[in-house]
């Protein structure tokens, strides 16, 4: 990621930030418009940055449907699986959990 991206990060929407970050890993595997749709579906809830002091803030990722930070990753994974499963084959996702993972993935 470029220095310019981080210098101007406050000018980007949540969707734009997510797109620029994930694009580094996805490349051209998912078309831009489809990837934006997946991201929009993933970050449709509020995740505020809360200041702790003048130099430290925290990103609250627990405002999603299951109140787990895993809602972000689980929703993104599910949307990507749907995109790549063009033949509508039955998929099985095996999850081991000791807490909130199951609810986030089941949703």
Language model regions located:
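PLP-dependent amino-acid enzyme catalytic core
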Residues: 1-107
């Amino acid at each position: 990621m470029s220095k310019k991206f981080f210098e101007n990060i406050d000018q980007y929407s949540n969707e734009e930030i997510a797109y620029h970050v994930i694009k580094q890993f996805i490349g051209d595997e998912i078309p831009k418009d489809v990837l934006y749709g997946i991201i929009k579906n993933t970050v449709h809830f509020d995740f505020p940055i809360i200041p702790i002091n003048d130099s430290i803030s925290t990103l609250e990722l627990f405002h999603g449907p299951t109140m787990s930070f895993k809602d972000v990753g689980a929703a993104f994974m599910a949307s990507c699986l749907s995109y790549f499963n063009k033949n509508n084959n039955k998929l099985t996702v095996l999850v081991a959990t000791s807490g909130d993972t199951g609810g986030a993935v089941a949703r």
